[in-house]
A protein has these predicted regions:
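Charged, glycine-rich active-site and insertion segments that engage polyanionic ligands
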Residues: 1-84, 95-106, 110-164
Length: 164
């Protein structure tokens, strides 16, 4: 990747991890890389709103507004974003289980550290989080109402990230 595509070593390393050694998948990921910055911002605003929403009815409105914003995007972008979320939760779990060598994501969003988020992703909630994200992706693929699907997912995430 570094020689053929003329990219930086840290980006090549990240893409090599994500593609699991598959060169064709790495090229696809390289082309999608420019789309990821808004994904990071959306992810951070989503999990922050989900944290605040526990026992705070006013913060539920933030989740609904977030859902409406993401629902306004195309279905393919929504699916890519949900895949990105699965990767982020996986990275947080790896950090929580003290395997930093396997963590390849570097957040570019100011004032958000994956290390601080990691303790909220554990063995008690990760399977449910993955299931809910996968179900949401499935329903979006089947032309479900994205606003309803994402609002439901957001409320479930609020419950799941506080699960000990």
């Amino acid at each position: 990747l570094i020689l053929r595509e003329n990219i930086e070593a840290c980006l090549a390393d990240k893409i090599a991890h994500q593609s699991q050694g598959n060169y064709n998948k790495a090229l696809l990921l390289l082309n999608e890389e420019s789309e990821e910055l808004p994904f990071e911002e959306w992810f951070v605003s989503w999990v922050r709103a989900a944290f605040r929403a526990k026992g705070n009815a006013a913060a539920i409105q933030d989740l609904i507004l977030w859902s409406e914003q993401i629902a306004g995007l195309g279905r393919e972008t929504q699916k890519k974003f949900l895949n990105f979320c699965i990767d982020m939760f996986r990275q947080a779990l790896l950090l929580n289980y003290e395997t930093p060598k396997l963590v390849y994501m570097e957040m570019k969003v100011p004032k958000f550290q994956l290390e601080n988020f990691a303790p909220f992703v554990n063995g008690n909630n990760i399977n449910d989080i993955f299931k809910e994200l996968s179900d949401a992706m499935y329903h979006i693929e089947r032309n479900g109402n994205a606003k309803i699907i994402l609002t439901d997912l957001s409320i479930k995430l609020t419950r799941l990230i506080h699960k000990k």
